[in-house]
């Protein structure tokens, strides 16, 4: 009689032992990424954004090149960038110009005559330059960025114009040629990667 009771006791103990161990307090996970805390920053003061837009637009108007573009091939600082001449610098210049057009066009100051004139000069530069833009070499494919940024800038600008205007047609044709170039530059899978 003692033996069956001992067996039942040990069997019951074995069954309850894992359940008791499972009730322990779980350990804190160490692989969890903490949620960033929102900084305690006061809201913008009236006019704060207006001043920032003014400074940015004034900077772009002041630094626009005589040919209507922005940027150049000189390295500022100590960065070395793979940039075969002459196509690499031209690609950077056209991409920078398109980004500046997009920024000016999106700013609340886009209606000012000086801003309109600067964007028109930049568009003229891109319309003249983009047909000659090509890949620098097999490794340097920055022209994909330039075609993309120019397509975006021309589309944004054309959206503010009357569809029957000459300028609208010029921008539309420039945008159409960027789409054609991007289709030619697409990878075998049909997209554009970092090195397409």
Where are the regions a protein language model picked out?
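Bacterial N-terminal signal peptides
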Residues: 6-16
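Positively charged n-region of N-terminal signal peptides that target proteins for export
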Residues: 1-4
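Preference for long, amphipathic alpha-helical scaffolds in soluble/luminal domains
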Residues: 18-196
């Amino acid at each position: 009689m003692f033996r069956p009771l001992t067996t039942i006791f040990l069997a019951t103990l074995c069954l309850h032992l894992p359940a008791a161990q499972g009730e322990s307090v779980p350990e804190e996970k160490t692989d969890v990424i903490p949620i960033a805390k929102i900084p305690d920053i006061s809201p913008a003061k009236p006019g704060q954004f207006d001043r920032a837009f003014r400074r940015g637009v004034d900077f772009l108007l002041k630094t626009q090149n005589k040919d209507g573009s922005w940027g150049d091939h000189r390295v500022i600082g100590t960065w070395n960038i793979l940039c075969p001449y002459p196509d690499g610098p031209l690609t950077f210049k056209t991409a920078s110009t398109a980004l500046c057009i997009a920024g000016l066009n999106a700013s609340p100051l886009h209606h000012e005559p000086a801003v309109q004139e600067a964007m028109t000069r930049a568009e003229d530069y891109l319309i003249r330059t983009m047909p000659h833009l090509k890949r620098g070499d097999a490794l340097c494919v920055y022209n994909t960025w330039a075609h993309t940024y120019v397509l975006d800038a021309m589309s944004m600008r054309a959206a503010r114009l009357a569809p029957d205007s000459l300028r609208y047609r010029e921008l539309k044709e420039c945008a159409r040629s960027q789409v054609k170039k991007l289709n030619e530059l697409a990878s075998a899978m049909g997209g554009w990667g970092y090195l397409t």
